[in-house]
Amino acid sequence: FLRSPAGVRDAAKTGVLHRQAVEVLEMIGDPDRCTVMLVTIPEETPVNEMIETSFAIEEELGVHLGPAVVNSVLPDLDDLDHELATLAAESSLDLTDNERTALTTAAGFRAGRLRLQREQLDRLGAVLPLDQIRLPHRFGSSIGPGEIAELATVLTSAIEALPEEGDE
């Protein structure tokens, strides 16, 4: 899509189409008029795709990149194994061995997902020195007006917290 103006400019050597293509190329190359914000999720393949796309957009097209938006970020749950064990021991619940095993397995799975997520977020930050706007994972099968409002609030706060251009 962003390569189209260059194709039109090269195909139409003169005339209105050529002038308009040149104007579009000037616009998308001007960071005051055009900034691209790419969105990913904190998993290996999507992060790889964002990195590749970012370099292509900047190097090949000269388009300025804005902050990276990372969608569906799981909340950190430090010490989840200990918390589950403590809660199980302190509560009046009479858990079976199978239930304790299931809780331990679930905690291990969640801890592994969080570790992978942190690795990808760290890698993204190391390879692409862009600010990151992180949107929380929404648990559930649908998103309604309430969830959209919550995400909008998080997004607005994150944008307001970004450093001003030149303050970095």
Language-model segments: residues:
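Short, surface-exposed acidic/glycine-rich loop or hinge patches that mediate macromolecular interfaces
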Residues: I41-E44, R138, S142
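Conserved catalytic-core segment of NTP-binding enzymes
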Residues: F1-V127
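C-terminal accessory extensions appended to soluble enzyme cores
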Residues: R134, S142-E168
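Long, low-complexity intrinsically disordered regions enriched in Ser/Thr/Asp/Glu with frequent Gly/Pro
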Residues: E119-D122, I133, G140
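Structural signal for conserved beta-strand scaffold positions within catalytic alpha/beta enzyme cores
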Residues: L38, R134-P136
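A general secondary-structure junction signal
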Residues: V70-S72, P136-F139
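Phosphate-binding and hydrolysis-coupling loops of NTP-dependent motor/remodeling domains
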Residues: L130
